[in-house]
Amino acid sequence: VERYEAIRQIAAEIGAHYGQVEVETVADLFAESIGYATPKLDVRGAVFQDDKILMVRGRQDQLWTLPGGWIDVGESPSTAVTKEILEETGYLTKPIKLVACYDRNLWGERPYLQHVYKLFFHCQIISGAPQTSLETDKIAFFAPDDLPPNLSTARVTPSQIHTLFHHYHNPNLPTEFD
């Protein structure tokens, strides 16, 4: 038990250093973790209109990203991406293809405390109108050569967006994965 506690403390110190947070914050997260460690799942929706992709700007960080978020326990990936797009944009959509499943740690971003797999879906608008939310303060469509400079690369990278455009123009391509 003493060895385990010492290792957990060292891990908290390392996590705090790389996550740029207090050691106590990481130690508390470790204390809350129960059971076998498994990855978290993040969904992102690629919605296209007039050869542009739908993006939202986060109210808190003022960074642009694709609409999306964490999959809740008991929720399917397609239900999660549909819900997230509706909540963040006002558009009701239908997922038509799983474009990619990526390991977040392999895409050049600073490591996240938990391991994250990102699921990118191509979705079609069924109905609705642009509407901001508690999480988003702007909604816009962007061309592939005119992406916003303040992109939330922790959520989506420019190369991932270009992959989504490639699949949009070539719908018969297979799903990509790491």
Residue ranges and their predicted role:
Residues 2-44:
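Acidic, metal-coordinating catalytic segment for phosphate/diphosphate chemistry
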Residues 3-9, 16, 55-56, 79-84, ...:
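A broad, low-specificity signal for short, low-complexity segments enriched in glycine/proline
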Residues 16-33, 63-64, 97-111:
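Charged, low-complexity, helix/coiled-coil-prone segments
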Residues 23-25, 75-76, 169-171:
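Juxtamembrane/interface motifs at transmembrane-helix termini
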Residues 27-66, 93, 97:
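N-terminal strand-loop-strand
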Residues 71-95, 102-160, 176-177:
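Unchanged
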Residues 164-178:
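Acidic/histidine-enriched, glycine/proline-rich intrinsically disordered or flexible terminal extensions
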